[in-house]
C-alpha cells in the first residue's frame, strides 16, 4: 500500500488526530524543540550529524551522503531500522520527519519500504510544520473569541475553568507551561522548551477551533511569562483585548484555596496524613520517611521562592514572612501540624500578590463584563451560554 506524503494542507488533520511521529533528526536538534506526538529515533546521532555537516560544507552533497551511508551500515543500520519498525508496529499510523523533509527522512522512508513498511513523511519537514503551527496561533488570535478569567491570587480561577469544561471550550495555559504562573508555581515536571510550549499551544488551538468553531474559549488571565516560557505576542495581545470576567473572593477564602493547593495537596499534607495514621509495619514507616523528606524539600523550595522575591517584599516583610515559614516548618516537623502555614500564606498574599495584581489591573484599566464570586461567575457563564 502506498502512503502519500503529508503536505501543508494535511497538517491540521495530522495534529488534531494526535498522529504518532518519528523525528529522525539528531538528539541535539530534538531537545531544542519538536512536533507534538514525536519520539526521537535519529538516523544520525549528534557526532555523525556533525561529521556529515562538515563534509557537506567542504566537499558537497554527494560526499556527505556517501559518508552517511558508510557510517550507518551493517549492524548500525539494522539497529536503527529495528527501532523504527518496533515503534511503527505499536503505532501503525506513524509519520516521519526530519528538518526540511530532505535526505534523512527520505532515506529512513526508503529503508522502511525495503523492509516492507511504507510510511509517509512530512513534506518540508519540521521547518514547514513549525511555521504552520506559528501561523495557527496568529490566525486563531485574529479570528477566535476569548473569555478571560481574572482575579487575585487564590480566588479559584483554575478551579472555575475546570468546572465549566462541560459548558465551554477551555484552554489551560498553566498546564501547557507546567507552571502555576507565580513565584511559587513550579510543578514537579520540568517546563517545556519555549518552542515545545508554542507547538503544544498551537495544537490545542487547532483542536479547539475544530471542535468549537463559534464558541468563545475560556482562558485564565496570565502575564506574558509563565515560569520560563512566554505567550506568543499575537495571542497575548488578543488576551489583553478580550472580555474579562473578574472572580472576587474574600481573603480568608483565598488563603484556604492556596493552603489546599500548596500544602494539603502536596507532600506536606500527604506526609501529615501518613504520620497521623501510623502503623507498626516497616513499609508504612518507610513511606512516611519518603513523604517527610519530600515535604521538607518542598519547604526548602518555598523558602527559595521567597528569597527570589525578597527585594520586592522589602527587608522587614521578607524577614517576617520567612520566620513564619520557618515556624510552619518546625510545627510540621515537631508536632505534625500544618495549619500554621496559613500565617505566611496570608501575609504573602497581602504583602506581595495583591499589590502586584491590583497594580497590573490599574495599568490595564480593566473593565470586566462580570465581577463576583467563583460560583457567581460560574452561574453567569452558564446563563450566558444558554442565551447565546
From Swiss-Prot:
Top class in the EC scheme: transferase
One of the record's GO molecular function terms: transferase activity, transferring alkyl or aryl (other than methyl) groups
Superkingdom of source: Bacteria
InterPro entries for the chain: P-loop_NTPase, Rhodanese-like_dom, Rhodanese-like_dom_sf, SelU
Enzyme Commission number(s) of this protein: 2.9.1.3
Active-site residues from the entry: 98 (s-selanylcysteine intermediate)
Cystine residue pairs: none
Pfam families documented for this protein: Rhodanese (PF00581)
Catalytic activity: 5-methylaminomethyl-2-thiouridine(34) in tRNA + selenophosphate + (2E)-geranyl diphosphate + H2O + H(+) = 5-methylaminomethyl-2-selenouridine(34) in tRNA + (2E)-thiogeraniol + phosphate + diphosphate; 5-methylaminomethyl-2-thiouridine(34) in tRNA + (2E)-geranyl diphosphate = 5-methylaminomethyl-S-(2E)-geranyl-thiouridine(34) in tRNA + diphosphate; 5-methylaminomethyl-S-(2E)-geranyl-thiouridine(34) in tRNA + selenophosphate + H(+) = 5-methylaminomethyl-2-(Se-phospho)selenouridine(34) in tRNA + (2E)-thiogeraniol; 5-methylaminomethyl-2-(Se-phospho)selenouridine(34) in tRNA + H2O = 5-methylaminomethyl-2-selenouridine(34) in tRNA + phosphate
Transmembrane segments: none
Alphabetized UniProt keyword annotations: Selenium, Transferase
GO biological process terms held by the UniProt record: tRNA wobble uridine modification
SMART domains in UniProt: RHOD
Sequence ranges assigned to domain Rhodanese in this UniProt record: 15-138
CDD domains per UniProt: RHOD_YbbB (cd01520)
Family assignment from sequence similarity: Belongs to the SelU family.
Subunit relationships: Monomer.
Main function: Involved in the post-transcriptional modification of the uridine at the wobble position (U34) of tRNA(Lys), tRNA(Glu) and tRNA(Gln). Catalyzes the conversion of 2-thiouridine (S2U-RNA) to 2-selenouridine (Se2U-RNA). Acts in a two-step process involving geranylation of 2-thiouridine (S2U) to S-geranyl-2-thiouridine (geS2U) and subsequent selenation of the latter derivative to 2-selenouridine (Se2U) in the tRNA chain.
Name of the protein described by the UniProt record: tRNA 2-selenouridine synthase
Native species: Nitrosomonas eutropha (strain DSM 101675 / C91 / Nm57)
Amino acid at each position: 500500500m502506498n502512503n502519500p506524503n503529508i503536505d501543508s494542507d494535511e497538517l491540521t488533520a495530522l495534529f488534531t488526530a494526535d498522529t504518532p511521529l518519528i523525528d529522525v533528526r539528531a538528539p541535539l536538534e530534538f531537545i531544542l524543540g519538536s512536533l507534538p506526538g514525536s519520539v526521537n529515533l535519529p538516523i544520525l546521532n549528534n557526532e555523525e550529524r556533525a561529521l556529515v555537516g562538515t563534509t557537506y560544507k567542504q566537499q558537497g552533497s554527494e560526499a556527505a551522503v556517501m559518508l552517511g551511508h558508510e557510517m550507518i551500515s551493517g549492524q548500525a543500520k539494522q539497529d536503527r531500522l529495528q527501532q523504527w519498525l518496533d515503534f511503527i508496529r505499536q503505532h501503525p499510523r506513524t509519520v516521519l520527519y526530519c528538518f526540511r523533509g530532505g535526505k534523512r527522512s527520505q532515506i529512513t522512508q526508503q529503508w522502511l519500504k525495503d523492509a516492507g513498511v511504507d510510511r509517509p513523511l512530512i513534506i518540508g519537514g519540521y521547518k514547514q510544520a513549525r511555521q504552520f503551527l506559528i501561523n495557527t496561533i496568529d490566525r486563531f488570535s485574529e479570528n477566535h473569541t476569548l473569555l478571560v478569567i481574572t482575579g487575585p491570587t487564590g480566588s479559584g480561577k483554575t478551579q472555575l475553568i475546570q468546572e465549566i469544561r462541560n459548558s465551554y471550550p477551555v484552554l489551560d495555559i498553566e498546564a501547557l507551561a507546567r507552571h502555576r504562573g507565580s513565584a511559587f508555581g513550579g510543578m514537579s515536571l520540568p517546563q517545556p522548551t519555549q518552542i515545545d510550549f508554542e507547538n503544544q499551544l498551537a495544537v490545542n488551538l487547532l483542536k479547539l477551533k475544530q471542535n468549537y468553531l463559534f464558541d468563545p474559549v475560556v482562558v485564565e488571565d496570565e502575564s506574558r511569562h509563565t515560569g520560563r516560557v512566554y505567550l506568543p505576542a499575537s495571542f497575548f495581545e488578543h488576551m489583553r483585548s478580550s472580555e474579562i470576567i473578574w472572580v472576587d473572593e474574600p481573603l480568608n477564602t483565598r488563603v484556604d484555596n492556596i493552603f489546599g493547593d500548596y500544602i494539603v495537596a502536596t507532600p506536606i499534607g500527604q506526609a501529615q496524613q501518613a504520620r497521623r495514621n501510623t502503623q507498626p509495619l516497616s513499609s508504612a514507616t518507610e513511606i512516611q520517611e519518603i513523604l517527610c523528606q519530600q515535604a521538607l524539600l518542598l519547604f526548602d523550595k518555598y523558602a527559595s521562592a521567597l528569597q527570589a522575591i525578597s527585594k520586592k517584599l522589602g527587608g522587614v516583610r521578607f524577614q517576617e514572612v520567612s520566620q513564619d515559614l520557618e515556624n510552619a516548618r518546625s510545627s510540621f516537623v515537631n508536632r505534625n501540624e500544618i495549619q500554621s502555614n496559613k500565617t505566611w500564606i496570608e501575609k504573602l498574599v497581602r504583602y506581595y500578590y495583591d499589590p502586584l495584581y491590583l497594580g497590573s489591573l490599574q495599568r490595564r484599566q480593566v473593565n470586566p463584563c462580570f465581577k463576583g464570586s467563583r460560583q457567581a461567575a460560574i452561574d453567569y457563564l452558564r446563563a450566558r451560554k444558554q442565551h447565546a
